[in-house]
Amino acid sequence: MTELGDWVSIDPDSDKPLFDQLRVQIIDGIRDGRLSPGTRLPTVRELATHVGLAVNTVARSYRELEAAGVLETRGRFGTFVARADPADAAMAAAANSFAEAARSLGISRDDALRYIESALD
């Protein structure tokens, strides 16, 4: 298990929500190699105690990262860094959300792709 709490820094005075600060720092830790794929993370309660956050705040960060495919929970064994590239998982989640929104608004595939191309330019 990694000592995630040793390098996570939460700024309670920031405009950015606490759960999002933690979420971003976990992603950064994966990208820069501090957290390798398969690394077991501290339990929600352990990390909350170590960094001084509420249990629900840490749980929300873990849930959102799990939904994006960045983390995976293996029942009673704990929460681990997923084996997939977090950028791939995050982009897939964003693409799925965009596609869902486009479908619900009745936007055609071609029009939806034009929105993407315009946003990338």
Curated annotation (Swiss-Prot):
SMART domains: HTH_GNTR (SM00345). Gene3D superfamilies: Winged helix-like DNA-binding domain superfamily/Winged helix DNA-binding domain (1.10.10.10). Residues 44-63 bind DNA. GO terms for cellular component: cytoplasm; extracellular region. Residues 16-84 form the HTH gntR-type domain. The keyword Heme does not apply. Keywords: Cell wall, Cytoplasm, DNA-binding, Secreted, Transcription, Transcription regulation. It is found in: Cytoplasm; Secreted, Cell wall. SUPFAM superfamilies: Winged helix' DNA-binding domain. Disulfide bonds: none annotated. Its main location: cytoplasm. GO terms for molecular function: DNA binding; DNA-binding transcription factor activity. Disruption phenotype: Deletion of the gene has no effect on the growth, morphology and intracellular structure of the cells. The deletion mutant is more sensitive to vancomycin. Disruption promotes resistance to aminoglycosides via manipulating purine metabolism. PANTHER family: HTH-TYPE TRANSCRIPTIONAL REPRESSOR YTRA. Transcriptional regulator that modulates resistance to vancomycin and aminoglycosides. Negatively regulates the expression of several genes responsive to vancomycin, resulting in decreased susceptibility of bacteria to vancomycin. Negatively regulates the expression of genes encoding the ribosome binding protein Hsp, the small subunit of sulfate adenylyltransferase CysD, the L-lysine-epsilon aminotransferase LAT and the protease HtpX. Also modulates purine metabolism and aminoglycoside antibiotic resistance. This is HTH-type transcriptional regulator MSMEG_5174/MSMEI_5040.
